[in-house]
Swiss-Prot record:
Top-rank taxon: Bacteria
Species for this entry: Bacillus subtilis (strain 168)
Important for catalytic activity (site feature) positions: 329
Coiled coil: none
Cited function: Involved in the TCA cycle. Catalyzes the stereospecific interconversion of fumarate to L-malate.
The reaction(s) this protein catalyses: (S)-malate = fumarate + H2O
Family to which this protein belongs: Belongs to the class-II fumarase/aspartase family. Fumarase subfamily.
An example molecular function term from Gene Ontology annotations: fumarate hydratase activity
Assembly description: Homotetramer.
Any one Gene Ontology cellular component term annotated for this protein: cytoplasm
GO biological process: fumarate metabolic process; malate metabolic process; tricarboxylic acid cycle
Name of the featured protein: Fumarate hydratase class II
């Protein structure tokens, strides 16, 4: 491999000749050989959005030469297109302020932008700190990139996946709204409802989760940029934060604003913690939905078996013909991971000391992982399971007919205690509810048939 020599305030460093990063990126690569968790590409792209916006804001304020600003913006555009993805090699496990990832972007942009200017016969050079990082600190850029990355991830990945699953389940709810089945509470038989009503509960969970996620995501639209080192804004123009936020808004199509209190923006990550709490709520709902699906599909002969789900792959290496609810299993594991991520984020967010929280990389890494897993998990569950959910009408009817809880319909007519006598006798002697009612001489057959109609038990009755 060929190398070139780069320099920083600590001296010379050998850097791969085919890469645009500089000395500080190389030092980070050598000093933090920890794990395989790279800084998420969404953070890299958010930094490109930010550096493009800061260059244009500095240009508007007269703090950066127009030629330099345009060269920086051009390189950032290429980064956003994925042209230099292999120039961002750093892991999450680095300085807690994210300084090395900030400098990684500064160095790549500066070196490539300088090369662009040379191609245009310009004698200007672009410095990673003085030009690309002008009016900025890692302490305000990294939290800004965190918020930009988080908001875009929610809207570009999570919301489409959530909407798709929600809409398909809504179609199922409407299609199966006339199929009366037995309800279950405490894992025991309960009064009837329709399969459509049961699924409609899942739909409403997803609707509420989306509402909570979007409301929480709005909290992350306030950006730290302009606070520089400790929140005072030293070395930045008073209007810098607002101008950068305007540029980011233009570029992304999402509304961002300058945080009203930069001291809070640097040292606290309560907003992203709050937003991840909404992701955890979605994970809890998905855990419940996936569990319901696999319980309802359990069997095929000795389980509940009231719905049929797609058979995607063999389920056992020893039991021939076995097929398992693998999409539900994958989704429940994802939900467990999101709950673990929430614990990590909550603890990390509590560790802001004085003017700066230095757990930033692990916070955004876990947040973006949660969005990725939830999005991919919902897409997979949708494509390989939800679209193929069908009712097993024969089993549904058999379970409904055998349920003792249909006796609840008799409460208004013969009272709770007499209804309980019927249920207990039926259970003890293996009778139907009708047979037990007749044996106890509490009702005639005609009265029982008129009072116990499962289809009339699925809605309120005056």
């Amino acid at each position: 491999m060929e190398y070139r020599i780069e320099r920083d305030t600590m001296g010379e460093v050998k850097v791969p000749a085919d890469k645009f990063w500089g000395a500080q990126t190389q030092r980070s690569k050598e000093n933090f050989k920890i794990g395989s968790e790279k800084m998420p590409m969404r953070v890299v792209k958010a930094f490109a959005i930010l550096k493009r916006s800061t260059a244009l804001a500095n240009k508007r304020l007269g703090n950066l030469d127009a030629e330099k600003a345009e060269a920086i913006a051009a390189v950032c555009d290429d980064v956003l297109k994925g042209k230099y993805d292999d120039n961002f090699p750093l892991v999450v496990w680095q300085t807690g302020s994210g300084t090395q990832s900030n400098m990684n972007m500064n160095e790549v942009v500066a070196n490539r932008a300088t090369a662009l200017l040379k191609e245009k016969n310009s004698d200007q050079t672009i410095h990673p700190n003085d030009d690309v990082n002008r009016s900025q600190s890692s302490n305000d850029t990294f939290p800004t990139a965190m918020h930009v990355a988080a908001v875009l991830a929610v809207y570009e990945q999570l919301v489409p996946a959530l909407d798709q699953l929600r809409n398909t389940l809504d179609e199922k709810a409407k299609a199966y709204n006339d199929i009366v089945k037995i309800g279950r509470t405490h894992l025991q038989d309960a009064t009837p409802l329709t399969l459509g009503q049961e699924i409609s509960g899942w739909v409403h969970m997803l609707d509420r989760s989306k509402e909570m996620i979007l409301e929480a995501t709005d909290k992350m639209r306030a950006l730290a940029i302009g606070g520089t080192a400790v929140g005072t804004g030293i070395n930045a123009h008073p209007e810098f934060g607002e101008l950068v936020s305007e540029e980011i808004t233009k570029l992304t199509g999402q509304t961002f604003s300058s945080s009203p209190n930069k001291f809070h923006a640097l040292t606290s990550h309560d907003e992203i913690t709050y937003a991840h709490g909404a992701l955890k709520a979605l994970a809890a709902d998905l855990m419940k939905i996936a569990n319901d699906v696999r319980w309802l599909a359990s069997g095929p002969r000795c389980g509940i078996g009231e719905i049929v789900i797609p058979e995607n792959e063999p389920g056992s290496s020893i039991m021939p013909g076995k097929v398992n609810p693998t999409q539900s299993e994958a989704l429940t594991m994802i939900a467990a991971q999101i709950m673990g991520n929430d614990a990590t984020i909550g603890f990390a967010a509590s560790q802001g000391n004085f003017e700066l929280n230095v757990f930033k990389p692990v916070i955004i890494y876990n947040f973006l992982q949660s969005v990725q897993l939830l999005s991919d998990g919902m897409n997979s569950f949708h494509d390989k399971c939800a679209v193929g959910i069908e009712p097993n009408k024969e089993t549904i009817q058999e379970n409904l007919s055998n349920s003792l809880m249909l006796v609840t319909a008799l409460n208004p007519h013969i009272g709770y205690e007499n209804a309980a006598k019927i249920a207990k006798l039926a259970h003890k002697e293996g009778l139907t509810l009708k047979e037990a009612a007749l044996k106890l001489e509490l009702l005639t057959e005609e009265q029982f048939n008129e009072m116990v109609k499962p289809e009339d038990m699925v809605k309120p009755k005056a």
